[in-house]
């Protein structure tokens, strides 16, 4: 893991802590945090209280960021302005990594939302895929693609990918199929392939201009399976 990479590239005189932490089980998360923090002289009571506050803050953040995206959608539709759902990994929020791509899209007159709009949305199902959904961020990107596919032509899907990141190798095919079955294009931006955003800007501008020429959606296709 990352902790091993960091530890092997630093001076052995610098200690690196890498406790095992899970976020899948609240009880286990609390236990792991209290055990680790106890080594720093923090009491079990304070540690448990801190975890409780942190979980509440995370829940509030998820709600706030989803509500913000929903407000952007409502306001954009009121003004009849186009929207792009820009999906990616957590590290794509770093302007240096994404080359300020979201700002560039906004400068083209398109409002930008993220895949956070489907956070905690249990109404969206992604059963029509061949993937085993075991990664949280991958699942959210799939849900975001499914949500976009159900929307009008005013909302389009653009995905950033970098370094051939792990599950992207097969995730991209599934996202493409979801969108194409619903008559929508899939725009993929490999942002680690460029040093400037000129080519990326051209791709996005082409998408925006094509939407002006083809405002109607295609016909939705059924999910295809084959007996084995």
Where are these regions (language model features)?
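An N-terminal assembly and electron-transfer interface module characteristic of large anaerobic redox
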Residues: 1-228
